[in-house]
Structures are given as structure tokens and as C-alpha cells.
Amino acid sequence: MIDRYKHQQLRIGLVSPEQISAWATKILPNGEIVGEVTKPSILHYKTNKAEKGGLFCERIFGPQKSGICACGNYRVIGDEKEDPKFCEQCGVEFVDSRIRRYQMGYIKLACPVTHVWYLKRLPSYIANLLDKPLKELEGLVYRDFSFARPITKKPTFLRLRGLFEYEIKSWKYSIPLFFTIQGFDTFRNREISTGAGAIREQLVDLDLRIILDNSLVEWKELGEEGPTGNEWEDQKVRRRRGFLVRRMELAKHFIRTNIEPEWMVLCLLPVLPPDLRPVIQIAEGKVMSSDITKLYQRVIYRNKILTDLLTRSVSTPGDLVTSQEKLVQEAVDALLDNGTRGQPMRDGQNKVYKSLSDIIEGKEGRFRQTLLGKRVDYSGRSVIVVGPSLSLYRCGLPREIAIELFQTFVIRGLIRQDPASNIKVAKSQIREKEPIVWEILQEVMQGHPVLLNRAPTLHRLGIQAFQPVLVEGRAICLHPLVCKGFNADFDGDQMAVHVPLSLEAQAEARLLMFSHMNLLSPAIGDPISIPTQDMLVGLYVLTSGNRRGICVNRYNPWNHRNYENQRSKNNNYRYTKEPLFSNSYDAIGAYRQKRIKLDSPLWLRWPLDQRVIASRESPIEVHYESLGTYYEIYGHYLIVRSIKKEILFLYIRTTVGHISLYREIEEAIEGFSQACSSSYGTYTKLSNSRI
């Protein structure tokens, strides 16, 4: 069993046949060795119990009930005085039934079988190491052709006759004509190699260090040749160099992890523990089993037939044995990865069996759904919406979610402050949503960060810490600038919220995971808290303004009539000309009263600028007033002069959107300056105190 304190990681890889046998083998007190599954049966047809030597055998995988053997005898688990530890009649060990979740078995295959993951998956590791085309290896594995086994210092039929040099695609049609059945079997076993056994022989002969050295030499030679001018030849060289790089990396990995290449060919097939492929008894003598169990049954059926054929090989035709070996290979392929080669295996209702790969991989696989996507306590989930008024390090948490996540803390606060005498009364107050509950919830949330996570968590910024604040509604409010780190947008995305409980987790959240401390991408160092998607569109709309120039009313009578004389409903457009405002507050107030629009051009009083005063630009228009003052109208600004030609006021041409953006930037700069000055003052005080 995996100890969660000792084992902090999980790795899927190759193991030796000896290791598989060690995992599954048990030695009984009488010296009998058990662990091999030899029967495809699930339940015995008479006793309706697990078949001995079958896929649910209690001798191999452990008792179905803790401390009770197949005979019905009972022993106290863990009692040193109880002896023996095994039942002498049925051979079942007196242990906890949870052993059936991790005790494995094995099937001894009558012929070697290649592991489909390492043969059919791209890139093919077997084809990479052997430096041969995948199509050729597939034909060899599935008995479509064979090659001559080299035998040194011995005359061979193939070499003497000179009929075949290496590959013999027609061996099963031409050679048997010259032999009897017994003679052909002897010839085949001596000089012809086919199937997974042929692959295993070649993998055993490999020297990984020689492969590494030869591949490196060839890679350097191809790099020194340079381009030939022929595009097809150059592309062929590039592909070969890429293949050599992958081959060297694979050889290095095998050397570093002490993995032998021949382990990619199976001689012993591990059998999963029975509780991971359960069986349900639905009626008398009828059971419902998992797809994995049915695929195991098919492997055992075909392997048993092949074993019987090999035991009486004197009278068995060679073609029959070869065909049965191919069926065993296909059955193991379907068990490991159904449908990888050709049509997948189906049941009586034409439903595709779920193989081991289907159980492991994908969104609904064992890793992503059960191990990585587990439901945890003190967590919630909801849709995210934009919260533009929030600070960068804050998030809006709905009251419904917050009261559930922080319920234990609120109960403790109610009991400490004496509004509630016990837990039952405190829960009653929470259900009734009394005002004191929200006050205590606010106090609890002030010093407690939360973690927001958006799946899939592909990098460090996929989960960040925030200071929660209560909001109305049922959606989580999020500052728009943190969306890029989460790869989120506001079109219905959901995010999970978690509450760190321990002091270590809270300290880690505050010191390392707060959003305002993760402003740069950990991968490339670029700023990651930048406006994206909806924010860019909003900034464009806010600052686009009206495209009409300042002379549009004068030279376009149609626009002049529409802009000056036309009135919209509800008196929403009272200003017939571009209005003048003395400050930004008046302009925004007019917008809120719906007297002007967001992109309506207006004149805003601005401090006198020496660059404008010294400018030699000629005005477009000059408007005179009855009291002698006049307005000089330029492209982007307006100057009000007195009768003595003195500059009274300066106005700039802008919109409410530009004003709003400018005010936000100005407030942000002022806040940053105040923060810097306060921190500098604190540093000065500390320095003076030390002096």
C-alpha cells in the first residue's frame, strides 16, 4: 500500500518480470507459491464464491471479509497469539480485506507480447531504439512476416539455399512446402524469428551506450555536410537529425533510470487488484463485471488455448500456433489500449470496452478526476464577474459562499463574544442570518486570505491569493487585471475558492501567492497584470471620442442640423454646442445627468501652459462677445482673451471618457507617491533611531 507520508510522487514506467512476480507472489506456510491467475472464471457455479485461481481468487488477492477465509473460519487480525496466519484448508490469509485494493496477481503468457504503448504510440520507442520503420515492426509483431535468425558457425537452410537474406514475407507459404509438420516446427524454432519474441531478441542485443555514441557521431557528420541545394534532400537530413536527437534522449533516459529495453516486451502480465475492477452480483448466478475484467478474461482464454497448443506441438500445425499467438497479442493490446490497432473490441451490445488507458487518461480518467480533481472541504465554486472597483489584491466573495466557508470561524466568534452559548445556538443564528453574524464574518475575513483557482492550473499563476470582501449576488468578483494569469475571461468562466486553514498555509498565501506580488510572468519575466480582452475594448470605447472635427458644423449643413437642432427623447441632449466646463467634476456631473454623452466633445478649463501661449499656430475661428472678450478656437484647444488681449482661460477639447481615464491615472500616481513617501519616512525614522 502507498504510504502518503513516505511517497510524495507517482511515476509510471517499465518494470522487470522479476519485479512483477515479486509484487504478486505469496508463499503459503505449506510452501505453495500463489499469485498466478490461471482461470478466467469469476464465481464458482456451485458455491457462488470466488473461483480458486481465478480473477477474484481469495488466495491470491486476500479475503473478501476481514479475518474470514473462504471456508468461513475467523481469526483476529493482528493478534500474535493466533496461529497460523493462513487457513490450512483453503490457503487464504487472515488479513484485512483492504488488501484486495493493492494486492496484485499476474498472468504467465505463453508467448512474449509487446507493450502497445511503446510500439504503437507516437513516437514509437521500440522503433526509435531499433532504428527501423514502425510499419516493419508491426508486421513482425503481428506475424505478417519474419526474418532469419543468424546462427554463427552453423550451416543453415536459408543461407545454403540463398532463398532469403533478411526479411521473409512469404515464409509461411513457401517454406512449409518442403517440410513435414514436425520438420517445419524444428526449422522455425531454429532459424526463423517472428512475433514479439523477435523484437525481444533484438532489444536484448542492444547496447545503449554504443547507440548513444553512434547516434552522436552520425548527428555531427550530418551537421557538417551543410545544405545541398536540394530541398527534398535537406528536409530528409533535418528529419534524420531530429530522429537522432530523440534516439539519444531515449537512450540517456533508459541508462539514467536503469531500465532494460527488453522490458518493453511482456512475459508476465500484471493483474489489477480486484477492488479496482469490482464485480456486482445482480441475481442468482448472474454477475455484472467491469470492462477490465472482461478483457482479462479474454487474455486468459486465448493464452490458455495457446498453452494447450504448445504442449501438444507435435501434432499442431505451425499456422495454427502462429494465429493463436497473434490473437494473444491482440487481446493484450485491447486490455492495455483498446482501439489503438484497427477496430476496437466490443461487447454483445456493440459497445467498446474501456481499456486501462481509457481508465487512466482524459478528463474523466483516474488521475484528473479522482487524484487531481478531488473535492475538498472549505472550498466553493462559482462564476466570475468583473469587479472594477476592487483593489488588485481583493476579490468579491458572495455572502452565501462566505458564510459556508467561514462558518466554523464565525461559530467560534459567536461563542467568544457571548451572543451564542454553544455550537447549536450559533448555527441557529447563522441560519436565521442575524446582523451579528455578518459583523463577525467581516471581522473573520479581514485577516484571512482565500485562494482562487481556475482549472486547468498550468502554471504558478493559475492559483493566487486574495483578500476577500463581501459582495451581493452569487458570483465571485475579480479584478480584471489578474485575468491573464488565470487565462480567464468574463464569458461564464468558473473559479474555485479555497480557504487556507493552517498558519503555514496562510503565511505562504500572504508572502508568496497574493496577486499584487505576482505582477511578472515566471516563465519569461514580462508583465502579466496588463489590460486584455474586455478591458482593451472598454478603454477603446472610453477614449475613442467623437470623430467629428471642430469644423464639421460649419462645412456640413446636414451634420450641423443633426447636431445642433435635433433633440433626443427625455431631453438627454440639452447642449446644442460643444459646452464649456470649469472642472472635471462638472463635466462628469453633466454626463451622469444625461446632458452629454460619453463621447461628446466638450471644452474643459485647463491650467495655462507656456507651450500653448508661445505657440505660433493660427486659430481656426475667432468668436467675439458683446463685452469685448473673444474666443480663439484651435484644433485641440481654445483660448479666452480679454479686451486687452490678455489670456483669461485655456480650454482643451476632450470627452468625458478621456476625463475619467485621466482621473483614474492621476489618482493611481498620487496613491503610489503617497505610499513611497510614507515608506521613505518610515525608513528615515528607523535610521534615525538606530543612529
Curated annotation (Swiss-Prot):
Keywords, in A-Z order: Chloroplast, DNA-directed RNA polymerase, Magnesium, Metal-binding, Nucleotidyltransferase, Plastid, Transcription, Transferase, Zinc
GO biological process terms, semicolon-separated: DNA-templated transcription
Cofactor(s) this protein requires: Mg(2+); Zn(2+)
Gene Ontology MF terms: DNA binding; DNA-directed RNA polymerase activity; magnesium ion binding; zinc ion binding
Cellular component GO terms, alphabetical: chloroplast; DNA-directed RNA polymerase complex; mitochondrion
Cofactor note: Binds 1 Mg(2+) ion per subunit. Binds 1 Zn(2+) ion per subunit.
Compartment(s) of residence: Plastid, Chloroplast
Top enzyme class: transferase
Amino acids binding Mg(2+): D489, D491, D493
Chain positions recorded as Zn(2+) binding sites: C69, C71, C87, C90
UniProt catalytic activity: RNA(n) + a ribonucleoside 5'-triphosphate = RNA(n+1) + diphosphate
SMART domains the record matches: RPOLA_N
Subunit details: In plastids the minimal PEP RNA polymerase catalytic core is composed of four subunits: alpha, beta, beta', and beta''. When a (nuclear-encoded) sigma factor is associated with the core the holoenzyme is formed, which can initiate transcription.
Family: Belongs to the RNA polymerase beta' chain family. RpoC1 subfamily.
Protein purpose: DNA-dependent RNA polymerase catalyzes the transcription of DNA into RNA using the four ribonucleoside triphosphates as substrates.
Identification of the protein by name: DNA-directed RNA polymerase subunit beta'
